[in-house]
Structures are given as structure tokens and as C-alpha cells.
Amino acid sequence: ILESSRLPSFKEDKVQEQAIHQLKQRGIDGLVVIGGDGSYKGALALSQKGIDCIAIPGTIDNDINGTDETIGFHTALYNIIDAVNKLRDTSSSHHRCFVVEVMGNHADNLAIYSAIACGSEIVITDKTEYDENKIIEELKICEEEYHKKHAILIVSEKILDVEKLANRISEETGYSGRSIVLGHIQRGGSPVPEDRILASKMAEEAICLLEKRKSGLCICMK
């Protein structure tokens, strides 16, 4: 297992050649590359230079073209649900509205799926209409007509300032607005069974392809 980090300079031909030299020096003639779009591009570049590479989709964003599932998505989703369940306990007892920012990097899968699973009152992504005034009105209806003691808003990252929205909720509704950015807690933890099974299936297929000297391919789940 080589491990990795972000390396923008890998786009450069000389850096790719250096990587190939390191691989050959260590007797490595095939790679299974796990990651997202950037990792795929790096794997393709190496395969075009003679290194057998098979790519496996690994990202919590679940936004890789050609596959319905990516390794890590289900675990991140579970982490979000677990966190929101705990927030709901305290929000109910203190009449609060939590504005929860989740990851996704412009993909709305984590926000949409977690909102459905958690039963959140409102979900905001770059594909939904974002109108603060409408959100305030919806929260007033939740409180005054449905007599809800709490509310949960799930928001995709890079959409809005969750702290600013929480402050406005405090000022204009009966709820005490609070914001929380779940951040990298979504990326960690023990993998859930869905991810373990998916990773095992994809790994088996990747190894089979490398044994057949196939290269420049990615594993997909349909």
C-alpha cells in the first residue's frame, strides 16, 4: 500500500516520469489506484506511459461518472446520520434549529440521502432553490402550525454561510439557531458493511484485470 496525498504537480510529465522510475526501482509493474477524479487522471497518465493501472472509485461524494456507488459514501452517510441523531436529541430539549453543513464538493448525494434518512425539515444544495426568506417562513410554519420543538436543516458545503443563517433563524423565529460544520468527521470511522462488501468486490475485479495485463480501466458498480 503506497498511500498518497494531493499532488497537483503530478500533471507535469517530469513528475510522472519520476513516479514511473520509483515504481520500476521497486519492481512494481501494476497499480490499483483508489480515489476520485484527480486519481483517475493520474492513473490514466501512468497507463499511457506503460504502467498497468486499474482505478477504483473511492470518494465520499459518490460523484464518479460510470458507477452508481463509490467506496466511502455509505460510511460517510452513516456518520452524518449518527451525528444528526445526536443533535436532534439536544435540539428537541432546547427548542433549537440546527443548520448542519455536510461535505459533497458540489455533489448533493450526501446532503440528499442524509436529509431523507434523518427526516430533516429542509435540505439545501446547489440544485435546490435557496431563498432565505422562504426558509424562515417554512420554519415558522414548523413551529407555529405543526408545533415542532426542533428543526434540522441539512446544507451542502460551499453553498452558504451556515453560521449567518443560524443567526437569522434565532432573530426571526422562535427557534434558537445553531450551526455546525461536520467536516472531516464524515471521512473517518470504521467502514459500514456496504462499503466493506463493495470494496472487496471491486478489489477482486481489479486484481483479475491486472493479472490479465489489462490497463487504463476503472471498476464500476451498476
Q: What residue spans do the PLM features occupy?
A:
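Glycine/threonine-rich beta-strand-loop-alpha-helix active-site module
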Residues: 49-86
